[in-house]
């Protein structure tokens, strides 16, 4: 049995954050051919479920924080240490860095989150008048369009209420702030960091990660490493590549993924996932 693990943003989703009909139909063809297809993403499970619509396939979400099988049955979850999470949240608040908290039912964000990012972008534009900021703002708005996002007045209170917390996501246009946050995170041994974009830091439990979750799902189905096909574009897909026998980088992927890949497919705006699946099903990719 083969397994295809597919990232979402920058991979299965196009620049409009939509799954094209071509990609959706290709996944169905792979499933009909007896291949286990799973989504492996940094997004929350409920957000993925809303996007997948009629595709009943396993979901690895929150960078490995949760694994759901077909039928939306929870297989595994890896929770963030509350004390460690609160410590880094306090740091982010002290530096005025926008962040979201991934829980079972919501993506919790600060009540003033959108205004905070808009102020950062205004500063960036003032310092760099020739900077093209429309695409940057569109990237920020993707965060606020996610299913289940819920702005709250005192986001730090989530760490006192007994919520299951899987991940924190930071977003900033201030690269110095992000650099400092990455350095701060190195002191928190119970936490790990990765990224799905230039302006993003994803914070997760040290024992979490896409690669570990993909290995766990493959073990449940009795799938060997050489039969795992991982498709991605960003730094948070590197751990998937480490456990997959076949590593498919998108044309729009970072260079490090392309260097580690066994195949480079078309971009996410050219239905690159569908292109690779068709190559695999037709025998053109061995």
From Swiss-Prot:
GO terms for cellular component: cytosol. GO terms for molecular function: 5-amino-6-(5-phosphoribitylamino)uracil phosphatase activity; magnesium ion binding; phosphatase activity. It is an enzyme of class 3 (hydrolase). SUPFAM superfamilies: HAD-like (SSF56784). Mg(2+) binds at residues 7, 9, 233-234. It catalyses: 5-amino-6-(5-phospho-D-ribitylamino)uracil + H2O = 5-amino-6-(D-ribitylamino)uracil + phosphate. Coiled coil: none annotated. Its EC number is 3.1.3.104. InterPro entries: Cof, HAD-like_sf, HAD-SF_hydro_IIB, HAD_sf. The active site is at residue 7. The keyword Cell inner membrane does not apply. Pathway: Cofactor biosynthesis; riboflavin biosynthesis; 5-amino-6-(D-ribitylamino)uracil from GTP: step 4/4. Phosphate binds at residues 8, 41-42, 210, 236. Its cofactor is Mg(2+). Catalyzes the dephosphorylation of the riboflavin precursor 5-amino-6-(5-phospho-D-ribitylamino)uracil and of flavin mononucleotide (FMN) in vitro. Also catalyzes the dephosphorylation of phosphorylated 5-6 carbon sugars and monophosphate nucleotides (NMP) in vitro. NCBIfam families: Cof-subfamily (TIGR00099), HAD-SF-IIB (TIGR01484). Belongs to the HAD-like hydrolase superfamily. Cof family. This is 5-amino-6-(5-phospho-D-ribitylamino)uracil phosphatase YwtE.
């Amino acid at each position: 049995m083969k397994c295809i693990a597919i990232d979402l943003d920058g991979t299965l989703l196009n620049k409009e954050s939509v799954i094209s009909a071509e990609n959706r139909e290709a996944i169905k063809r792979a499933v009909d051919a007896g291949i286990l297809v799973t989504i492996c993403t940094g997004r929350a499970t409920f957000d993925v479920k809303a996007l997948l619509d009629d595709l009943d396939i396993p979901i690895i979400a929150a960078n490995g924080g949760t694994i759901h099988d077909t039928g939306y049955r929870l297989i595994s979850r890896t929770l963030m240490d509350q004390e460690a999470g609160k410590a880094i949240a306090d740091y982010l608040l002290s530096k005025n860095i926008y962040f979201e908290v991934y829980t079972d039912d919501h993506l919790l964000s600060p009540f003033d989150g959108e205004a905070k990012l808009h102020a950062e972008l205004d500063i960036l534009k003032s310092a760099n008048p020739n900077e093209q900021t429309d695409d940057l703002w569109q990237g920020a708005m993707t965060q606020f369009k996610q299913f289940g996002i819920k702005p709250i007045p005192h986001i730090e209170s989530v760490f006192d209420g007994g919520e299951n917390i899987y991940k924190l996501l930071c977003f900033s246009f201030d690269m110095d702030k992000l650099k400092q946050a990455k350095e701060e995170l190195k002191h928190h041994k119970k936490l790990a960091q990765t990224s799905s974009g230039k302006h993003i830091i994803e914070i997760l439990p040290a024992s979490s990660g896409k690669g570990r979750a993909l290995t766990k799902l493959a073990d449940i189905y009795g799938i060997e490493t050489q039969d795992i096909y991982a498709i991605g574009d960003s730094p948070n897909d590197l751990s998937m590549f480490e456990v997959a026998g076949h590593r498919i980088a998108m044309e729009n992927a970072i260079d490090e993924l392309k260097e580690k890949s066994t195949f480079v497919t078309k971009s996410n705006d050219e239905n690159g996932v569908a292109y690779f699946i068709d190559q695999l099903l037709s025998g053109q990719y061995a």
